[in-house]
């Protein structure tokens, strides 16, 4: 098994996390949130979704968010310091051994970055109370749909991005494989809920959302690792941004929420 690749994160990545909310970016989860429960958010980023969960579980509940990127946690602690039932911890999932167990564990857009998602699910399972529940939200990157097609430079960048991920042991279609992964790790009552992200001009800040691939291309990591020439990376950003302003109609990112119980 490959070790999980270190993915470079910066302030732009922090901004992406800060823009997320429960209502817009984990829209079906609210149906299983109840006052008084204890929730663990694995890979919480800055805690922007965690704080929305904390508001729903209320003062008798608690949300613990963990993330292995320190700048995310530091940012979230500052932004959400007034949310008294939210605790944000800088730690890797596999090093996290709390005394208490959780009623619900959630993890959004995280397992896509791991080469060992099954081990991560087993670790999460060990942190659940009896009859506890898990909810995993993640992408199928192999079925991204742009309308119309973006410039060839961005198509080439995206193809390279998927290869870079695959070579690192990441599953580009983990959204489709989550039900079987949960079954293999001993969960039952498994549900798969379509949660596709659709962005067009009727959606608030849709240009920013479609522009996520310019932000991804903003990282030089694939250049440094020999996957991409820097000129192509810069060309992809420039031409894609122009396409967003002049041609883009919509983008659909395939996303599933998968739930299971123990």
Predicted regions located by residue number:
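Helix-to-beta-strand junctions that scaffold the AdoMet/dcAdoMet cofactor pocket
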Residues: 34, 58, 114-115, 128-130
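Conserved alpha-helix/loop element of class I SAM-dependent methyltransferases that forms part
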Residues: 19-35, 52
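A short acidic, Gly/Pro-enriched loop at the edge of an enzyme's catalytic core
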Residues: 94-105
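A short glycine-rich, Lys/Arg-flanked "PGG" loop and its adjoining helix->strand segment in the class I
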Residues: 118-133
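A short SAM/SAH-binding and catalytic strip from SAM-dependent methyltransferases
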Residues: 103-117
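C-terminal helical/coil "lid" or tail adjacent to the Rossmann-like core of SAM-dependent
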Residues: 3-5, 11, 191-249
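Conserved catalytic/acceptor-binding region of the Class I
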Residues: 135-203
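Class I SAM-dependent methyltransferase SAM/SAH-binding core
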Residues: 40-42, 46-95
């Amino acid at each position: 098994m490959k070790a999980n690749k270190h993915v470079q994160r910066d302030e732009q990545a922090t901004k992406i996390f800060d823009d997320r909310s429960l209502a817009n970016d984990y829209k079906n989860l609210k149906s299983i949130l109840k006052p008084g429960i204890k929730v663990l958010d694995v890979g919480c980023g800055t805690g922007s979704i965690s704080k929305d969960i904390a508001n729903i579980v209320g003062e008798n509940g608690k949300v613990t968010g963990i993330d292995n990127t320190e700048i995310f946690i530091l940012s979230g602690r500052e932004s959400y310091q007034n949310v008294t039932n939210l605790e944000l911890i800088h730690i890797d999932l596999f090093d996290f051994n709390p005394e208490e167990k959780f009623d619900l564990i959630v993890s959004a857009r995280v397992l896509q970055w791991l080469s060992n998602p099954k081990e991560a699910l087993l670790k999460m399972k060990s942190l659940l109370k009896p009859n506890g529940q898990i909810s995993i939200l993640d992408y199928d990157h192999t079925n991204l749909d742009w309308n119309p097609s973006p410039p060839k430079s961005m198509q080439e960048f995206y193809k390279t991005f998927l290869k870079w991920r695959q070579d690192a042991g990441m599953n580009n279609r983990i959204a489709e494989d989550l039900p079987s992964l949960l079954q293999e790790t001993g969960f039952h009552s498994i549900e798969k809920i379509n949660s596709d992200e659709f962005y067009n001009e009727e959606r608030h800040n849709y240009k920013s959302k479609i522009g996520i691939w310019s932000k991804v291309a903003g990282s030089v990591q694939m250049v440094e690792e020999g996957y991409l020439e820097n000129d192509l990376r810069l060309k992809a950003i420039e031409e894609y941004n122009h396409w967003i302003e002049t041609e883009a109609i919509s983008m659909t990112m395939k996303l599933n929420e998968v739930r299971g119980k123990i």
